[in-house]
């Protein structure tokens, strides 16, 4: 619901940017929904800040175009997820839509080539887990992890664990998203 004089919270590692963005959005929305706008910079910041309790009232704005990363953010149960910079008017419109609690996802249409199980492997590798830790976490055999990672590397066109990690965190050289 829209709340007059409620505080829109912009969550960022840069307090000045957060304050300026809050002021600019308040000027465009005299009444605004009670939501948190999380600026996912550096990449991964949103995973630290969004909790299961806060996800349903959180919008995340990210620069990471990795489809698996975007899916992982969305699967937190976010109210909204947007890729790349938006104009202040676009951000204000996203926040207006929050009144209905309609989930909004404005991300590239590119879909992951990975199965859900392979996506789990990529996510855990990208968080620094070793194969044995991944096997324990997923309740599968170490050899299953190794075989699965081989398929992940093939599908992503990477040749190593390190390249897969760089891909997930959107640091690898990839073709630009349109």
Name each model feature, range by range.
Residues 105-109, 159, 178:
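Short, polar/charged, Gly/Pro-enriched helix-capping and turn/loop motifs at alpha-helix termini
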Residues 97, 127, 170-171:
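Residues within well-ordered alpha-helical secondary structure of globular protein domains
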Residues 128-163, 167:
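Recognition helix of helix-turn-helix DNA-binding domains
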Residues 100, 114, 158:
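Hydrophobic patch in the ABC ATPase nucleotide-binding domain
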Residues 171-178:
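…primarily DNA-binding HTH/wHTH and HhH modules…
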Residues 1-105:
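N-terminal regulatory/sensing modules of transcriptional regulators
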Residues 105-144:
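Helix-turn-helix DNA-binding segment
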């Amino acid at each position: 619901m829209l709340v007059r004089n409620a505080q829109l919270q912009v969550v960022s590692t840069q307090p000045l940017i957060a304050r300026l963005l809050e002021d600019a959005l308040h000027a465009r929305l005299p009444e605004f929904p009670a939501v948190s706008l999380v600026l996912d910079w550096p990449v991964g910041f949103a995973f630290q800040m969004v909790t299961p309790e806060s996800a349903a009232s959180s919008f995340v704005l990210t620069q990471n175009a990795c489809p698996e990363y975007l899916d992982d953010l969305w699967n937190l149960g976010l109210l909204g997820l947007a890729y790349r910079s938006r104009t202040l008017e676009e951000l204000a419109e996203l926040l207006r839509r929050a009144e209905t609690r309609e989930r909004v996802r404005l991300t590239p249409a590119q879909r992951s080539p990975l199965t859900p199980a392979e996506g789990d492997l990529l996510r855990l590798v990208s968080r620094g887990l070793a194969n044995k830790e991944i096997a324990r976490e997923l309740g599968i055999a170490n050899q299953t992890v190794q075989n699965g990672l081989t398929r992940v590397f093939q599908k992503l066109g990477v040749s190593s664990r390190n390249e897969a990690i760089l891909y997930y965190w959107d640091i690898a050289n990839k073709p630009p998203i349109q």
